[in-house]
Amino acid sequence: MSIEWIQGACAVPDARVQAASLARQEQLTKPPGALGRLEQLAVQFAAWQRNEQPTVQRIWIAVYAADHGVAAEGVSMFPQAVTGEMVRNFARGGAAIAVLARELGARLEVVNLGVVNDPGELPRVRRAWIAPACANICEQAAMTPAQLRDALAAGAESIAQARTCGTQLFVGGEMGIGNSTAAAALSCALLSQFPQAMAGAGTGLDAEGIAHKATVITRALAVHADAATPLERLRRLGGFEIAALVGAYIAAAQAGIPVLVDGFISTAAALVAVHLNPGVREWLLFGHRSQERGHAALLRALEAEPLLQLDLRLGEASGAAVAIPLLRTACALHNGMATFAEAGVSDA
């Protein structure tokens, strides 16, 4: 399978439904704009769904797990074995995102792309194995061209499955010790930022640990200074799960499925996806502003205003999942409120 599919046209929201939904908002029993961004969200979902009565009930959450060679540089508080252990935890339903998915009635897909501490076959885990880990970005490219192709395809496969269920919202998450370092390096390359501005606490590093992380990123950027395109930067500085997120975001936009983006690492993947296929941006919402240092710069680059700011930095799609009740509320108000005419209430 080639990767030419990532350049394919994205779906276009329905302008007629958008206009009709805006007109309805103006007639609901409230002052114009009184429900603020909730009004905008409802209209956005109506246009996405081509339905003047939008809902956000069928949700597909995919968490991509993969290990990183850069973990050998001591950039995390946790050992690399944790990635595989967390895959088991996802499968057993004990992780934060598993709890949130149950609470939301969402479908949770866990995808094992390659972990050092391999848990093997597990129920409710899709095995899309590429390698035990991507390479150390301080020494060589994270992925070969074939590995990048397979990682992108693994993300697209999530969307292919989600489409068969009539999914109304896709949420992507990640798990991988060392992946905040890879995401920060990738973000530096895409935004021409200094590592000190993008390196954050990740799993809980102190100031000394963050400074070391920035030094590691500086080394990686020097090794890959000749990476000239977004795709090549992803191949050299990213990782399997970051590339899978990129593939999922592009495929979702092509399929007309809205995406709720999670935190720092997921937003770095979203930025790559938009660089590769600008039509993706129309289908992205951003769940929250992470506590991770570099997230604000990524959001600015994407002209994104996240729904929540709760000082989260867990990943796993958890922050995005927490924002889903807001989307449901927006649609419920849009669909359920009476118009002035229906209620017999005088308009202004």
Swiss-Prot record:
<dbReference type="InterPro" id="IPR003200">
    <property type="entry name" value="Nict_dMeBzImd_PRibTrfase"/>
</dbReference>
<dbReference type="GO" id="GO:0008939">
    <property type="term" value="F:nicotinate-nucleotide-dimethylbenzimidazole phosphoribosyltransferase activity"/>
</dbReference>
<dbReference type="Pfam" id="PF02277">
    <property type="entry name" value="DBI_PRT"/>
</dbReference>
<dbReference type="InterPro" id="IPR036087">
    <property type="entry name" value="Nict_dMeBzImd_PRibTrfase_sf"/>
</dbReference>
<dbReference type="InterPro" id="IPR023195">
    <property type="entry name" value="Nict_dMeBzImd_PRibTrfase_N"/>
</dbReference>
<comment type="pathway">
    <text>Nucleoside biosynthesis; alpha-ribazole biosynthesis; alpha-ribazole from 5,6-dimethylbenzimidazole: step 1/2.</text>
</comment>
<protein>
    <recommendedName>
        <fullName>Nicotinate-nucleotide--dimethylbenzimidazole phosphoribosyltransferase</fullName>
        <ecNumber>2.4.2.21</ecNumber>
    </recommendedName>
</protein>
<keyword id="KW-0328">Glycosyltransferase</keyword>
<keyword id="KW-0808">Transferase</keyword>
<keyword id="KW-0169">Cobalamin biosynthesis</keyword>
<comment type="similarity">
    <text>Belongs to the CobT family.</text>
</comment>
<dbReference type="InterPro" id="IPR017846">
    <property type="entry name" value="Nict_dMeBzImd_PRibTrfase_bact"/>
</dbReference>
<comment type="function">
    <text>Catalyzes the synthesis of alpha-ribazole-5'-phosphate from nicotinate mononucleotide (NAMN) and 5,6-dimethylbenzimidazole (DMB).</text>
</comment>
<feature type="active site" description="Proton acceptor">
    <location>
        <position position="316"/>
    </location>
</feature>
<dbReference type="GO" id="GO:0009236">
    <property type="term" value="P:cobalamin biosynthetic process"/>
</dbReference>
